Amino acid sequence: MFIFLFTVFLILILILFYISFRLYNFALNPKSSKEGIFNSKDNNEPRFQDTWIYDYKDKEDVFINSFDNLKLHGYILKTENSDKWAITVHGYTNKAESMSAMAYKYHSLGYNILMPDLRGHGKSEGSYVGMGWHDRLDILKWIDLIIKENKDSKILLHGISMGAGTVMMVSGEELPENVKVIIEDCGYTSAKEQLAYNLKTMFKLPSFPILNFCSLITKIKDNYFLSEASAIKQLQKAKVPILFIHGDKDKFVPFYMLDKLYNACSSKKDKLVVKDVGHAKSESLKSDLYWNKVEEFIKPYM
C-alpha cells in the first residue's frame, strides 16, 4: 500500500513539474512562441510617432554589462543643451523600438532619451524574462550611465506593462537624486499575481500548486522566486513621485491592480483611469488625455 501511494505521489509531482515547466517555457522563455497571449485585434494604422524611431538617424547604440555579466543594449537620442532625460521601458515580448511614441513625445519636449532593451529582449543578451525583478537592477545601471555622462541630469522613468512593473520595482531602491519622477502605465502588482491571473483566464488552471513549482524553476534557472518580483513591496519603499495609468477595459493586466498599486505607494502620487481602453492602448487611443495628465504631473519635478 505504501509503495502504491508513494508511486501515485511521485507521479503527481512529476506531472506538476511538467505543467510548471511548460508554463515557465511559455511565459518566461523569451525565445518561445507567445502566440495567444495577446488576443486583442488592433486594426488601427500606425501613427507617425509609432514608427518614427526606425527612421531616426541620430540614435546611438549603447551597451552596459549587467550584474550577472549580460551585455545589454539601448539607444540614446540626444537633445542639445538639455539636462532632462527620459528612460522609456518597454513591455513583455517587446523591444526598445516599441516605445517609439513615448520617445517621440519626450524628445519633442526637449528631453534626451534612453531606450533600453530589457534582458532577453531586442538586442540584449539573456535567456529568461525577468518580470521586472532583475530588470530593476539593469535600469539602475542605465541610470548610472546617464549620470556619468551628465552629472546634472534630471531623469524620468516611463514604463508600459512589464516596463511599468520594472520602473515600479526600481522605485523601491535607493535612487540617486537625479531620478525625479516615474510614470507607470498598466503595470502589475507582482509577477506571481499576474501569472496566477493569466493561468486562470487563459488556461482555466489554479495557481496552486503550479506557480509554486514554477517559482522553484525560476529560482533554479534564473535566480529569483516569482514572489520576489513584487511591485507592491517596492512601492511601499518608494520616495520618488509616481503617476499610475491604467485602461479600465484591460483584460491582460487586470484593472483592479491599479488601486492595489496606488494604495501601496508611499511617495507622492496621482492616477489616471483611461475609459474604454484595453491593455497598453491608453497613449495611442486617448493621446491628448494621456499627455495632458503626464505633462501636468511631471512639470513640478522636471
Across the structure, where does each feature detected by a protein language model lie?
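Conserved alpha/beta-hydrolase
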Residues: 106-125
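Hydrolase active-site cap/lid region
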Residues: 169-224
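Short beta-strand/loop motif that positions the catalytic acidic residue
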Residues: 237-239, 244-246, 250
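The serine-hydrolase catalytic nucleophile loop
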Residues: 92-105
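Catalytic active-site module of serine/aspartate enzymes centered on a nucleophile-bearing elbow/loop
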Residues: 285-302
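Alpha/beta-hydrolase active-site loop
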Residues: 129-150
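An N-terminal hydrophobic leader/cap segment in hydrolases
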Residues: 4-65
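Short alpha-helix in the alpha/beta-hydrolase fold that links the catalytic acid
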Residues: 102, 231, 240, 254-263
